[in-house]
């Protein structure tokens, strides 16, 4: 066998193995969770699609329907019916397209043969995989961000007006997908300025100014909308102010370090000699800004304003940057002929470590609202059995919350998506004087004369009210049974011993 024949066979082996690994990974990490239960925010998507963005109950969270994303699940459900799988299809397709663009950008910015490695580096990040089966705007946002950078690079390479317009269109769309994506516009400015200053582009300053001015005009309506909503920002804070440790963890340094150390060890053990040239400065600037701008800006905004927006899903736009950073540091030790074997090793590791192999069929989110609602149905409760339902949304506070809050409504959208039998009693998101006053009234007038009642909601909320009702003198002697097989959703059944 000649050396050329051996190389050809080796090449054909990787050309078969890598697509197979990718299909297996996408099947396990993306496709299999598609039919699992919605989590809270996805049920919000269902509410917006079914009731429209102008439903009066959405006034408590006006930022929720402000996204062009909802056009996609609305179209999908109109074509294929309403189901978990259908609502998630737009995100699945968006992330597949984003993965393709990231691979193409890796070829342009790092190495022509680094595409597979970059793709599997993306799949190594759980937040990246999560978006593919999530009926929320983040998958579309990742695709639009990738498209922006792809066309920005092409425009700065060619100076063609057509490429400039192809950049402006998704760039004008990005902020309309989610208002929290504003820091990403710094990536466009930093990369463009780098190439203009170093004269690494045929694009002239005047032409660049025209293109960015056009983009600015397109974004003005969104800017006014964002400024109006900012006045209410404090009412929607769901996380504490981030620490420096939170910032460091958000950068996914583990992936970067593992890729660099693993490839370096392999190169030392196998005596590889990297044959690529150092990355151009502009490529390094683009990768670094993609990786760092979103987390750094949201960290600074949170600390300066006191309104924390440092939420993991708001940072997902930076994950492809982390994957490209991992590919970049690995490229310093990889000969051109070794990219595919290394990508295969990374892909196998991703499938092994991220596959949720403790479950036969992986969940999308650790919230089985569908299973919890089914459990309540299996209890065969009478139509008058009280079912106490705390809202899963932080906005459910007095005075917006009240015991006679009208249904269907956004704050209790889970009751419309996964209905439960019984007489529904609505509780707020968290404890308050008004909530406890209503609970005392309910306990003395309704629960005391019932044979049983149910608590149904998030684990922390149900746990609080279980302890609260256990301490009521009128319920002394009652027993309760907890059902905790639904992730962070819980069902508790209270029984009267002699009824």
Give the residues covered by each predicted segment.
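Short, Lys/Arg-rich, polar N-terminal cytosolic tail immediately upstream
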Residues: 1-11
């Amino acid at each position: 066998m000649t050396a050329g024949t051996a190389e050809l066979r080796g090449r054909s082996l990787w050309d078969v193995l890598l697509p197979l690994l990718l299909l297996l990974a996408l099947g396990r990490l993306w496709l299999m969770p598609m039919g699992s239960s919605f989590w809270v925010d996805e049920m919000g998507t269902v509410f917006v699609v079914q009731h429209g963005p102008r439903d009066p109950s959405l006034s408590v969270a006006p930022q929720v329907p402000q996204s062009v994303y909802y056009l996609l699940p609305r179209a999908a459900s109109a074509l294929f019916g309403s189901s978990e799988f259908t609502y998630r299809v737009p995100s699945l397709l968006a992330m597949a397209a984003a993965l393709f663009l990231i691979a193409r950008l890796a070829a342009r910015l790092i190495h022509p043969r680094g595409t597979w490695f970059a793709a599997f580096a993306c799949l190594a990040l759980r937040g990246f995989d999560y978006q593919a089966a999530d009926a929320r705007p983040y998958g579309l946002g990742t695709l639009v961000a990738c498209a922006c950078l792809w066309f920005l690079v092409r425009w700065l390479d060619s100076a063609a007006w057509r490429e400039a317009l192809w950049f402006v269109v998704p760039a004008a769309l990005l902020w309309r997908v989610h208002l929290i994506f504003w820091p990403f516009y710094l990536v466009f400015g930093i990369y463009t300025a780098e190439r203009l200053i170093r004269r690494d582009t045929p694009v002239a300053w005047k032409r660049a100014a025209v293109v960015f001015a056009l983009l600015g005009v397109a974004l003005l309506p969104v800017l006014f909308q964002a400024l109006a909503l900012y006045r209410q920002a404090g009412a929607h804070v769901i996380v504490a102010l981030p620490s420096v440790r939170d910032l460091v963890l958000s950068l996914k340094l583990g992936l970067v370090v593992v890729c660099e150390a693993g490839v370096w060890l392999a190169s030392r053990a196998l005596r590889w000699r990297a044959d690529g040239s150092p990355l151009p400065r502009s490529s390094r600037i683009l990768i670094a800004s993609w990786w760092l701008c979103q987390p750094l800006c949201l960290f600074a905004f949170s600390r300066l304003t006191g309104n924390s927006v440092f939420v993991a899903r708001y940072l997902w736009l930076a994950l492809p940057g982390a994957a490209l950073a991992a590919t970049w540091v690995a490229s310093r030790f990889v000969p051109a002929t070794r990219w595919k074997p290394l990508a295969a090793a990374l892909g196998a590791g991703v499938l092994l470590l991220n596959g949720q192999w403790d479950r036969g069929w992986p969940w999308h989110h650790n919230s089985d609202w569908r299973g919890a609602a089914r459990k309540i149905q299996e209890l065969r409760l009478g139509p008058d059995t009280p079912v106490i339902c705390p809202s899963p949304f932080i906005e459910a506070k007095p005075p917006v919350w009240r015991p006679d809050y009208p249904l269907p409504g956004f704050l209790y959208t889970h009751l419309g998506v996964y209905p439960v039998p019984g007489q529904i009693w609505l509780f707020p998101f968290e404890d308050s004087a008004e909530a406890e006053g209503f609970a005392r009234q309910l306990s003395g007038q309704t629960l005391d004369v019932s044979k049983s009642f149910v608590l149904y909601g998030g684990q922390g909320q149900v746990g609080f009210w279980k302890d609260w009702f256990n301490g009521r003198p009128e319920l002394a002697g009652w027993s309760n049974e907890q059902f905790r097989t639904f992730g962070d959703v819980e069902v508790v059944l209270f029984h009267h011993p002699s009824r």
